[in-house]
């Protein structure tokens, strides 16, 4: 995978087996992963619909999403964790750790996480979220 003139390993988003040799330590272990089961919903035209479908199917869930999308997601406000503004990837990246740690305190069985576009800083954000969700991605 190429990002400008930089080539990323094809294993960047691949699940790594525990006994597999990796290119860097950050590829093998979970970092900032909550105990709460998580699903990451990739950025797409139908992202909000997918999130709302998951909310309907799961009574005890919460959503980590973007400020401007909160009004479109059918979940009580006390079950919504604001990651920041969709167009402010720096804000989102600085909120990931605290947002993931809030999940376990909320007592939800499932966390549905709104993903960002996989380019620029968004690539790094998605890599972190994919690993936090243990590769459970829609």
Region roles according to the model:
Residues 1-8:
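Internal gly/pro-rich beta-alpha loop/helix module
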Residues 9-29:
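Long, charged amphipathic helices and adjacent flexible linkers at domain junctions
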Residues 23-134, 138:
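A C-terminal functional module that forms or caps the active site or interfaces directly
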